[in-house]
Curated annotation (Swiss-Prot):
Residue numbers binding substrate: 103-107, 150
Record's protein name: Enoyl-CoA isomerase/hydratase MYCGRDRAFT_76805
Keywords (A to Z) from UniProt: Isomerase, Lyase, Virulence
Example of a GO MF term: isomerase activity
Matching InterPro entries: ClpP/crotonase-like_dom_sf, Enoyl-CoA_hydra/iso, Enoyl-CoA_hydra_C
Lineage top rank: taxon: Eukaryota
Amino acid sequence: MFALAQHTARRTLSRQQWTKVVVSAANYSSGSLSSTIRISSIPAPHTGEITVLSLNRPRARNAISTALLGELNTVVEQLHAQGDKSSTRALILTSESDDAFCAGADLKERLTFTEEDTRNFLKTLRHTFTRLSTLPIPTISAISSIAFGGGLELALCTNFRVLASTASIGLPETRLAIIPGGGGTYRLPALIGETRARDLILTGRRVSGEEAYFIGLADRLVQISEQELGEKGVARGRVLEEATAMAKGICEGGPVAIRAAQAAVSGWRDGEGSENKAYERVIPTKDRLEALTAFGEKRKPSFQGR
């Protein structure tokens, strides 16, 4: 689907296989070794695929550099350009590193920026994050470790967040004498409410996976046992497994219906108009008739996305 070569994983993977897959990136991920994002895919139910984007700057804790941002922007724009013709039915953001989902901005690179460089970087960052947040397909972040600053803002751009109990997230920008600049000051309040968002942003404190789930910042919480804590790749594999299960569960629905529902919910502020417009997309589909036929025949429907 993308310019980078892709590797398709098997439809069903055990927990042990997932752990092995995550630890051995070469067996699962694709793309050049110098790539800051690795792209892979998993077959989705019925048709199409679930695309997995793995941030791949382990030495920098996946900090958002100009190069990483450029690659992310390219992938997001390709998905938008493909529209309904895209074979990607859901998107998962994860990490190639046990140590970090994303530590935020690349501060070492930022030290070399002029004020104009900083403004230009933020302009690209905001554009890319907004485009990610408006993709017509379900998007999920899988986080097992740290997601700070721009890393958390990146996760806020996805529809869902799966966190491990080992995760630690926050918006510490005020402690660096700045404020969140990638959407944190408006996406976080929209998600968890103004008061809780103000608490996290003004204090800059870190939040555990459990607290994130409690306040509604995480949609799924994966508990990691004490025994599993010391096992390489396990927490990362577990959240990816849960995120994939969530994506597959979503993709059990009709492809056109999932996109229509995504659009309707995104337009909830428009009320009935958004829903009615989205419903018109599914009425003429063959998948709708297939679902009715399958119900009458007491079998599972087979959707083709048309």
